[in-house]
């Protein structure tokens, strides 16, 4: 009887180890795939180089809840005397939204409630060409500290930023506060 019980424990342990190792391999492969997909989607928005910068801060935050995830990237660049030239270059490189984006599905709800807003001393502008509100970028300037910040947001399950009863600018500020810890 003891041999049977011991054999059963060994078999169950081996099966569990096999299952756990196969899950971890799948998770690792999926992680690599997800990383490359997210990187290349954000690559079109995020800057590829920084000329004459004083410092660069990069923050990549991924929040996972069961099958849903939110992926955000923050690049904050501090410039010296080159700031004005870099700001003008960014203004010419990016196209920005000129009007809020309202939801076609949910009446009165805004995917992008405002195209420009102030946040922590930065004048923020929403970049044009995103898949609102699932995937888009924001660029911000702070003339006092000579900093430019690039925010990238990706969440396939996100529905809207502002409901009809919310203040539109405050909703956008709360969106940035809740999703971009690195700012």
Language-model segment annotations:
Residues 1, 16-17, 73, 105, ...:
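Detector for methionine-enriched segments
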Residues 2, 59-61, 122-124:
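Short secondary-structure boundary micro-motifs
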Residues 4-5, 43-47, 125-128:
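Intrinsically disordered, low-complexity segments enriched in polar/charged residues with Gly/Pro
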Residues 23-96:
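N-terminal export/targeting and maturation segments
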């Amino acid at each position: 009887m003891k041999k049977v019980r011991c054999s059963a424990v060994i078999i169950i342990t081996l099966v569990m180890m096999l299952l756990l190792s196969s899950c971890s391999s799948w998770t690792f492969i999926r992680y690599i795939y997800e990383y490359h997909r997210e990187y290349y989607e954000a690559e079109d928005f995020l800057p590829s180089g920084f000329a004459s910068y004083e410092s660069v801060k990069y923050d990549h935050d991924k929040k996972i809840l069961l099958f849903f995830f939110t992926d955000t990237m923050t690049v904050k660049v501090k410039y010296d005397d080159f700031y004005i030239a870099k700001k003008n270059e960014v203004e010419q490189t990016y196209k920005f939204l000129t009007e809020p984006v309202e939801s076609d599905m949910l009446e009165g709800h805004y995917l992008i409630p405002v195209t420009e807003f102030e946040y922590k001393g930065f004048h923020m502008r929403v970049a044009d060409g995103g898949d609102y509100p699932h995937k888009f970028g924001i660029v911000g300037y702070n003339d006092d500290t000579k900093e430019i910040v690039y925010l990238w947001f990706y969440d396939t399950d996100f529905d809207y930023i502002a409901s009809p009863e919310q203040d539109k600018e405050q909703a956008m500020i709360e969106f940035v506060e809740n999703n971009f810890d690195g700012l």
